[in-house]
Structure formats: structure tokens, C-alpha cells
A protein has these predicted regions:
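Short, compositionally biased P/S/T/A/G/V-rich stretches that sit at domain boundaries
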Residues: 129-178
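Short amphipathic, basic-aromatic surface patches that mediate peripheral association
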Residues: 31-40, 171-186
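Aromatic sugar-binding surface patches on proteins
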Residues: 70-94, 213-220
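Short acidic/polar inter-strand loop motif in beta-rich domains
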Residues: 101-103, 110-121, 238-247
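Structured interaction patches on ligand/partner-binding surfaces of diverse proteins
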Residues: 114-139, 254-255
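Short coil-to-beta strand junction motifs in C2/discoidin
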Residues: 41-48, 183-193
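Surface-exposed, short loops/turns at beta-strand junctions within beta-sandwich domains
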Residues: 100-102, 224-229
Length: 255
């Protein structure tokens, strides 16, 4: 009888043992979607992704989003459904498998695009991950990154010149690298691009609008420097509908 009671006790203990006695593999897939555009992937250097335990700060996984920007017609359609899957097999993502013992609050931080650090942005979010649940299928965990890429191509930094009038050339694009142009989902008239001229001491001189060159994402304008000295030129881009913006800076010295 004692033996039977002990056996019954063992059975009950087994039945009452917590389900998560051992850590459970929990697949996670993270994609970063540029505001009003496509996924940020290999063509822009990817996004740095870090997953941390929110309570302890301990890193759990890190890496970069790799892959393509995705299917334009699928992502940019105005009629997509509530649960539409935007990712294709090639769409950029970072994948990891976390071993979770219990429901865990994590902080997911993304930074980039890594190939355009002058325009990079950082976004972080917290969420509860449950052991054994699949966070990798469909759209996975999708994070939206605001901003615009601005890259001043001319004048190069620290240019010394005798010419009072110089040409400004800038590349302006979405954070995924998607081009601005008349034959793209990102028409030129949607954006305001201008150059702001400052003296080296910080005094604002004036702003000059940049005009679309006819080549995808390239904007240009001449600007006149009135007196000798060092100047800063900050080229900015703004989307008044989404409120996305970006900037890049260069310097010029008029002899």
C-alpha cells in the first residue's frame, strides 16, 4: 500500500510539473520596412538588429537584415487587406532562434541602413515573446523605419574654391534605397528638397530649392557664396504627407 501511494505521488508530481521545465526553441524573423516604401536589405547594407531581455538588458540575438527590398506591386498597393503578407521568400529579414523558458519581454532595436550612415535611424520596440510560439512565418515581426536618405555628392567635404557659384548635387531616396522619379511609386512632386547655407559660425544665410535632374533620385541647384570664408551646406528632404525627412551636410571654403 505504501508502494502504491508513492507511485501515485510520482504520477501526480509528473502531471503537475510545469510545461516549460526546459527552454523551448522560439523562432523569430524580423524585417524592417522603410516608411511608405519597401524592405531594407542587402542593397543598403541591411539593418543592424539586436534583441535583448528587457528586464536584464542581456543580448539574446543580433545580426543584419539580408535579402531583397521585396515585391513593389505587393507592398505599394493601396488596396491590400488587413492581414496581407507583404514578404516574399526573397524579402530582407533577420532570423534567429531564441530559447525561452518563460514568457519574456524583449526589446528589439534596429539601426541603419548601414550603407548610408549619415541618414541612419534607430527604432526600438518591446513585446512579450511566448516560449515555443512561431514569430517567423508570414510577415514575422515587422518594424517600420521613418526617414529619408540624403547623400550630398557635390561639393565634396572641405572643398576649397575660388568660384563664388558652385553646383550642389544630392542623391535623395527612400530608406530602402528605392528611387524618387516620375516613373516610380515615389513621384518627384511629393518631396521638398533644398539646400540650407550657413556660415561656419552657425549664422543662417539662405535656403535654395533643389530641382529634380531627370535622373532617378538626383537633385541639383547652383548656390552663390558672397564672401570668403568657410560655409556649411545642409541638404534636406521632406515628405509633407508622411512627415519623413532626412539631411546630409558638407563644407566649402571660399578663398
Amino acid at each position: 500500500m505504501v508502494f502504491n501511494m508513492n507511485r501515485l505521488s510520482l504520477i501526480l508530481t509528473s502531471l503537475l510539473t510545469p510545461l516549460f521545465l526546459f527552454a523551448m526553441p522560439t523562432p523569430v524573423s524580423i524585417s524592417v520596412l522603410s516608411s511608405d516604401a519597401k524592405f531594407i536589405g542587402s542593397s543598403m547594407g541591411g539593418m543592424q538588429v539586436t534583441i535583448r531581455d528587457s528586464l536584464t538588458g542581456e543580448p539574446m540575438a543580433s545580426g543584419k537584415t539580408l535579402g531583397s527590398t521585396g515585391d513593389t506591386s505587393l507592398i505599394m498597393t493601396e488596396t491590400r487587406g488587413r492581414d496581407e503578407v507583404l514578404r516574399t521568400e526573397e524579402s530582407a529579414r533577420f532570423e534567429a532562434e531564441l530559447n525561452l523558458l518563460r514568457p519574456t519581454e524583449v526589446t528589439i532595436e534596429v539601426r541603419g541602413p548601414l550603407a548610408q550612415m549619415q541618414s541612419s535611424g534607430t527604432v526600438s520596440e518591446t513585446r512579450i515573446l511566448l516560449p515555443g510560439k512561431d514569430y517567423s512565418t508570414g510577415n514575422g515581426i515587422m518594424i517600420h523605419l521613418p526617414g529619408m536618405v540624403v547623400d550630398v555628392l557635390r561639393p565634396q567635404a572641405h572643398l576649397k574654391t575660388d568660384a563664388k557659384t558652385i553646383e550642389i548635387i544630392a542623391n535623395v531616396a527612400k530608406m530602402c534605397g528605392c528611387p524618387i522619379g516620375e516613373d516610380t511609386p515615389w513621384p518627384v512632386e511629393r518631396y521638398t528638397v533644398e539646400a540650407l547655407l550657413y556660415k561656419a559660425g552657425g549664422e543662417f544665410m539662405r535656403g535654395v530649392p533643389l530641382i529634380y535632374s531627370g535622373e532617378h533620385s538626383i537633385f541639383t541647384a547652383p548656390i552663390t557664396l558672397e564672401e570668403s570664408g568657410a560655409y556649411q551646406i545642409i541638404v534636406t528632404a521632406f515628405d509633407p504627407k508622411t512627415k519623413d525627412s532626412g539631411a546630409d551636410i558638407t563644407t566649402v571654403i571660399l578663398k
